[in-house]
Amino acid sequence: MYPVDLHMHTVASTHAYSTLHDYIAQARLKGIKLFAITDHGPDMADAPHYWHFVNMRIWPRLVDGVGILRGIEANIKNTDGEIDCTGPMLTSLDMIIAGFHEPVFPPQDKDTHTQAMIATIASGNVHIISHPGNPKFPIDIQAVAQAAAKHRVALEINNSSFTHSRMGSEANCRAVAAAVRDAGGMVALGSDSHTAFTLGEFTECRKVLDEVGFPEERILNVTPRRMLDFLESLGMPHIPEFADL
């Protein structure tokens, strides 16, 4: 098990069922050292108001030795790469994931999806692309992986894509992992937990990475320091409270 989980939802996204406190408790039980809360961006019908994201700055950095990253799973809105994370939200958060969600960006065609995803990657506002293997949003996987490597944006391998959501993602996720491997990019693993009990669950992700021989040194979740160094390399501020993670 890796000690870092980069994708999960709380009761602030009303189709999820756990609180921040629940995740902290599970992190302590499971040996998770750093996790990111990434509730849905405000353009989703059940998402929190943008004030929720701005006010995350009041959260403690560490609770019982567990580090908490203030994040969002923003929505890709259009082919210009716009996302629903702007203004004060950008400066209040530590980490921004973005991806396609049908209520905000209805599925179209492969070229449109690819254009939108690459524009989002190139925008400089996003650190990780969520569930790029979603079969409802086919993309040019090679082109996206090359753009992600060029702009130092990680592509996610999402454990829920193999278990609860986005059925039929397996082959695409394998292709994404192989393309990122060949392009020299990074992957981020996300449990995409909607309940704290699946925090840190990467079993299916690990199978895919093993199948394609993905290099361990390019998996962001291996240590907290690797993830934090990645964020700092993209211009995010150093977080002194995490010095000993």
From Swiss-Prot:
Binding site residues for Zn(2+) 1: 7, 9, 73, 192
Gene3D superfamilies referenced in this protein's UniProt entry, alphabetically: Metal-dependent hydrolases (3.20.20.140)
Binding site residues for Zn(2+) 3: 73, 101, 131
Keywords assigned: Hydrolase, Metal-binding, Zinc
EC id: 3.1.3.-
Keyword Hydrolase set for record: yes
GO BP: any one term: bacterial-type flagellum-dependent swarming motility
Keyword Lyase: no
Sites where the protein binds Zn(2+) 2: 15, 40, 194
Cofactor(s), by name: Zn(2+)
Superkingdom in the source lineage: Bacteria
GO cellular component: cytosol
Cofactor note: Binds 3 Zn(2+) ions per subunit.
Name of a matching Pfam family: PHP
GO molecular function list: phosphatase activity; zinc ion binding
UniProt xrefs under NCBIfam families: PRK09248.1
Family: Belongs to the PHP family.
Subunit architecture: Homotrimer.
Protein name, entry field: Probable phosphatase Ent638_1550
